[in-house]
C-alpha cells in the first residue's frame, strides 16, 4: 500500500463513517509503491454502502467521492462491488484488494 493511503487512513475512515460505508477496499496500482506513479496515478477503491433510503445513494456516493478526492488531491475511482458484472474483472479485483474500512 502506498504512503499517501497510510498517511490519510484515519481521515478516510472518518469519511466512511460519515457517508454510511459498509466496506471500503483499496484496489489497483495504489496497492504497490512499484506500480503507483505519485504524480499521475489515480486511486481506485471498491465500495459497498450500508442500506440507505431510496434517493440517498447518489448524494452519498458523490459526497464520498468528493471527500476522497479532497483528501488525496487527485482523481479517485469508486467501484461498487454489486455493479461489477464482468467475471474476469471481478477475478482480477479479488486477487488484489486491501480492506481499509469495515463498519
Where do the protein language model's features map onto the residues?
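Catalytic core of pol beta-like nucleotidyltransferases
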Residues: 1-25, 29-38, 50-103
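The conserved glycine-aromatic submotif of the RRM
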Residues: 41
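Short, aliphatic-rich beta-strand segments
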Residues: 44-48
